[in-house]
Each structure stands twice: as C-alpha cells, then as structure tokens.
C-alpha cells in the first residue's frame, strides 16, 4: 500500500517531473464523482469529518441530478516508492452538451482515466470523450467501477474495454468508488504511467484557461494549466484573445478548497483571481501570458462554443423582465457559452431569445434561473438555426419561427448532426424505426461486443432537440445512450405552421417543421389548445395554417345560457324567438370578442403537459 504523502509538495516549487495531470472520462452515473471523493479521502486532502458525497459538485443542481456541469481541479499529494507526486485531477462533465468543456479539460491533461460502470458497460458519450482523449494523445488508464454491485460483470466489460483501446483485459483496473477497493492501485498506476508535463520554465509565461467560475465575493476565479514559464502574485497578466490586462490579486491551487501560493510553475494546475467581474474577460480556452514579457503565439485548439439550440425565455409576470435580464447577466458570468438577446412576443410580452449548447444546457439554465433567482418563466419550444433563401436571392438566418420570411421561398437549409446510438442488440429494430421517423439516414452499425451495437445516423438537429432523447429512452427501456456532433447543413422541405385563434396569429405557438409533419403538428397543437383554453361566450375557432392555407381546425364550443328555462310549455315560436335572439347576440359578440389565452394554457401547450388528454 502506498502511504499517504508525509508532506505535500509546495506549489511553484514543484519539479514538473513529479506532477501528474489527469482527468476522469465517464458517462453520467458511472460513479465519477464518487471515485473522486474516495481519492480526496485517501490522499488526505479532505478529512473524513468534512467529507460529503459528490464533494466537488458545488451547485445544488449538480448534486441533485448527480451530474457534473462545471469542471473542477484538485491537487492531491501521493507517495510511491519513496517519491512524492502532486496529482492534479481535473473533474470533467460527462454530458454531450458540455463536450467543449470536456475538450478544454482534456487539453490541460497528459492522461485520462476511462471509467466504466462494471454493470452497464460503455455508453455513447464515454466513447465520444474517449475519441477526444485519443486525439489529444492522452495516456488512457482503463478502469471498471462499481465492482461491488451484485449485477457487475467485470470480466465481460474488461474484455470489451481492452478490445476498444487495445491492450490486455488483465490491465483493466477494477475499483469500487463506494467501498474504496482498488483506488490505491489506481493512484499508483496514475503516478507510474501518466507522463510528466513538458514545458520551458524560462520561456515567456503561457497558461491555458480551462474553466472560469464566478464567485460573488471575489469576482471571476480562473482555472489555468501552466504550459511554459511561471506566474506570481501581483504580476500583470494579459489575455491573448482579448488583449485585456489585469493584475493577479491571488494565485494558488485548489486542494480542494482554494489555497493561495507563491505562484504556479510549469505543468501546474491552479487558479488565479484578478478581481474582474465578467467571465467573458477570461474566456475558456484563452492563453494567459505576462504583460511585461508576452508570449508570441497563443496555445492552439481553442474555439468559441457555438449555440446549437435556441429558445425564448419569458417571465410569467411582465414586471420581472429587469430581474430576468440581471439573472441572465449573472449566469453569463459563469457560463460563457450562453448567448441571449431581448425579443418581444405579442402573446408573451418581453423576454429573451437564448442560445444553448443543447437540451440539457437549456434545462439547467432554466432550472438555475428559477432556483437561484426565484423567477417563474415560460420557455418556448426549442428551435435550431435555419438559413432561408427567398426568391430575390436574399438569405435570412432564422432562430425564431416569427422571423421566417413570407412570400416565395427557394430553399431552407437546416443543421445536421452525426448521431451515434449505443444500445443492446435487441433494440436495433425499434431504434431504426425511431430514427427513420425523424428523417435519419443510416451511416452504419458496429457490434462492440456480442450484445451491444453502435448505430450511426445523420439526422436533422431540429428533429433531435424536441423529444428524441425521451422517446429513445422509453423505446429501449432506458438502455440506449446518444451522442451527437455537428455535421454541416442540408436543404430540406421545411414550412412554418402558424396557429390562429379566431383568425389572429399567436406567435408563441408557431413552429418550423418538415412539410410531411406539418399536418400532425397542426392537429396536435389545435387539439391541445382546445383542451386548455377556457370556453368563451362565443364559439372560438382554433386553426393551423401554412401561409394562407388552413390545414387543421378545432372549435371551442360557446357557453350558452338556457334561455328557455322560463318558458313552461308555451308556443314553439316564442322559444324560437328567444333562441334566435341569443344567436344574434353571440354573433355580435364574436365580431368584437377577444380571446384571452390564460398563462397556464401557454405553459402547458408549450411543455406538452396535455398530450394524454389531447389524444
């Protein structure tokens, strides 16, 4: 057994040869945060008294959903064969929406632990992140977790892992994050096999930002990995992409609580605080250098994360609009991938059009807005970016159905993604059926073991963002996993379906759909609204239209007073007169009447709560 390190190495004075930078690649729920907890305990960084489950997941929402959203970096001491090592573990998110965060974290490491649940095997997102790691030339340590589970089948999955990355099944480590079995061997293996960082200590300082977090008291905390040179407190630094200069107020390492130090040297991972209040000043993936002696070229491999999914966020109470703006500004401080701009809707009032990396990102942002800022919001149906070319050869970029141009349209192009679905082989038929119904084109399939298949499709992103993932999970009893990456765009026969209430268009319900699906969408929405809008004193027609052509209609029957109640028996002409009079009144009402759509109806129609009833 490796003893605990008697004394930790001092940051800024650590020889790069004894530094090991690694990250853990795993799918959601494969036990990455629990394994990280055990490592923190075994290296003595966190004592057992202050230990809590998922120690590194700071946000409530991360702990509750059991997912990691922001990357964290922790420095841990470990002793092996008489030498003390400084292990820097960079915790990465496992979800497809945050693949940019993953790529930044991987770029800061030399090695990766590929963590797989011994009861479930490899999932699609783990594969995607593994390919990213291999592209970055990282040393991979395969590990099976949860071997204490009764359902675990380590031998089968060890063989699967070994065949995937090349190697011997006996090299696959078996650990249990829960009981701590095998974690020491894993730390020994990390110290032995992961290469030490390489850099020039005398060159101009260059550090890569792999995460930045907003702290309410200290401003932006920037996590960096030093490549060359060193940084010290009170030094003036400059960001290479924005050319902004700041002074380092504090620099140090997380262990896992922030610990100030005398600086950071080659290969070290730590944080710096400059007192800046805006995360956009320290972009993830940017290069930090000293202002006095700047580096000539920035580090490669950085891109701006582009939003893939757009949705409108509107406060239920219009007076909350300024609060929503402040809340989004604050979230933007800690989430550089979020983009938003103000927009107005006739039906919903003032709000923001926001761009997200994917559906989970959208869900997390809306949940954080309601949780951390106490806002009640309506979220419109998610949409993607369309390029619409009209007859006069003008091209319009549409992120919102209301921007879709009228008149003759030559072509509409939509983003396409390459999707990889991993599932047990029994479900291949149902998955193919689902993908074909979503306009997917089969690229190929591969058997990863004797009973697991990877199926690859190209699909329009617009078909995935709405409810594809939920359908996939329900059709495969939760076994399938999905990963997708952008793959350009394609021209499609897309139309805009408008929903009309009493002849007036309600912009919140408009959608851009494929012509073959337009009728189904029209029937679904009109049926849904018929259930939700309260009956009026007059009949209200709900119509779905493409341009001027009505494709579906439902009517909300009028409420009627029983005008014949006072006639006991009596002449039929008397009754007819009263009924005709009522009819006239209703007609007049219909001419001037306006339909108020209650807020609840908007929320329910947009979130699909009434699907059961509407059918």
From Swiss-Prot:
GO molecular function per UniProt: GTP binding; GTPase activity; ribosome binding; translation elongation factor activity
Disulfide bond residue pairs: none
Keyword Hydrolase belongs to the record: yes
GO cellular component: plasma membrane
PROSITE patterns according to UniProt: G_TR_1 (PS00301), G_TR_2 (PS51722)
Entry keywords, A to Z: Cell membrane, GTP-binding, Hydrolase, Membrane, Nucleotide-binding, Protein biosynthesis
Stretches assigned to coiled coil: none
Main EC class the enzyme belongs to: hydrolase
Ranges where the tr-type G domain occurs: 17-198
Known EC number: 3.6.5.n1
Reaction catalysis annotation: GTP + H2O = GDP + phosphate + H(+)
GO biological process, one term: positive regulation of translation
Membrane topology (UniProt): Peripheral membrane protein
Binding residue positions for GTP: 29-34, 145-148
Signal peptide interval: none
UniProt entry tagged with the keyword Protein biosynthesis: yes
Organism domain of life: Bacteria
Subcellular location as annotated: Cell membrane
Reported function: Required for accurate and efficient protein synthesis under certain stress conditions. May act as a fidelity factor of the translation reaction, by catalyzing a one-codon backward translocation of tRNAs on improperly translocated ribosomes. Back-translocation proceeds from a post-translocation (POST) complex to a pre-translocation (PRE) complex, thus giving elongation factor G a second chance to translocate the tRNAs correctly. Binds to ribosomes in a GTP-dependent manner.
UniProt record similarity statement: Belongs to the TRAFAC class translation factor GTPase superfamily. Classic translation factor GTPase family. LepA subfamily.
Protein name: Elongation factor 4
Gene: lepA
């Amino acid at each position: 057994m490796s003893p605990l390190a008697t004394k930790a190495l001092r940051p800024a004075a650590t020889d790069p040869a004894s530094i090991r930078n690694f990250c853990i690649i795993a799918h959601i729920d494969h036990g990455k945060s629990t394994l990280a907890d055990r490592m923190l305990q075994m290296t003595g960084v966190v004592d057992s008294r202050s230990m809590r489950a998922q120690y590194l997941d700071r946000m409530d929402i991360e702990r509750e959903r059991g997912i990691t959203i922001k990357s964290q970096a922790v420095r841990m001491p470990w002793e092996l064969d008489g030498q003390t090592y400084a292990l820097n573990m960079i915790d990465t998110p496992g979800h497809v929406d945050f693949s940019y965060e993953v790529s930044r974290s991987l770029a800061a490491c030399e090695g990766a632990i590929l963590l797989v649940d011994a009861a479930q095997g490899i999932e699609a997102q783990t594969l995607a992140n593994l390919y990213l790691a291999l592209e970055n030339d990282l040393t991979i340590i395969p590990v099976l977790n949860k071997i204490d589970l009764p359902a675990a089948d380590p031998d089968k999955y060890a063989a699967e892992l070994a065949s995937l990355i090349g190697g011997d099944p006996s090299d696959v480590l078996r650990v249990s994050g829960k009981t701590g079995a095998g974690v020491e061997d894993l730390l020994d293996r990390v110290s032995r096999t992961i290469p030490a960082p390489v850099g020039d200590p005398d060159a101009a300082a260059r550090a890569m930002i792999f995460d930045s977090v907003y702290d309410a008291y200290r401003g932006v905390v920037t996590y960096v990995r030093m490549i060359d040179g060193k940084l010290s407190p009170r030094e003036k630094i400059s960001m290479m992409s924005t050319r902004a200069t700041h002074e380092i107020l504090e620099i140090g390492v997380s262990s896992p609580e922030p610990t100030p130090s005398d600086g950071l040297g080659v290969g070290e991972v730590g944080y710096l605080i400059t007192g800046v209040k805006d995360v956009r000043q320290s972009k993830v993936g940017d290069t930090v250098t000293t202002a006095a002696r700047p580096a000539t070229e920035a580090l490669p491999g950085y891109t701006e994360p582009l939003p893939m999914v757009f949705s409108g966020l509107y406060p239920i109470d219009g007076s909350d609009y300024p609060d929503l703006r402040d809340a989004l500004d604050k979230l933007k401080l800690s989430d550089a991938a979020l983009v938003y701009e103000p927009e107005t809707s006739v039906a919903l009032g003032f709000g923001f059009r926001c761009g997200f990396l994917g559906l989970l990102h959208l869900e997390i942002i809306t949940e954080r807005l309601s949780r951390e800022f106490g806002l009640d919001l309506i979220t419109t149906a998610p949409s993607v970016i369309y390029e619409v070319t009209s007859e006069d050869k003008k091209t319009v970029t549409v992120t919102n159905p209301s921007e879709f141009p009228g008149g003759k349209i030559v072509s509409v192009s939509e983003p396409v993604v390459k999707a990889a679905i991993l599932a047990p082989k029994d479900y291949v038929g149902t998955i193919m059926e689902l993908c074909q119904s979503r306009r997917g084109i089969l690229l190929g399939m591969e058997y990863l073991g004797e009973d697991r298949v990877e199926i690859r499709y190209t699909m329009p992103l617009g078909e995935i963002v709405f409810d594809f993932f939920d359908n996939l999970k329900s059709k495969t009893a939760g076994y399938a996993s999905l990963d997708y990456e952008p793959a350009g765009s394609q021209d499609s026969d897309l139309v805009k379906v408008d929903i009309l209430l009493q002849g007036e268009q309600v912009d919140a319900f408009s959608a851009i759909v494929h012509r073959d699906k337009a009728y189904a969408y029209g029937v679904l929405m009109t049926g849904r609204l018929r259930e939700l809008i309260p009956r009026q004193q007059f009949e209200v027609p709900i119509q779905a239209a493409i341009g001027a052509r009505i494709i579906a209609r439902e009517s909300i029957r009028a409420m009627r007073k029983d005008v014949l109640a006072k006639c006991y028996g009596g002449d039929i002409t008397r009754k007819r007169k009263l009924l005709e009079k009522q009819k006239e009144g209703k007609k007049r009402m219909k001419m001037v009447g306006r339909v108020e759509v209650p807020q609840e109806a908007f929320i329910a129609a947009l979130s699909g709560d009434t699907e059961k009833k509407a059918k």
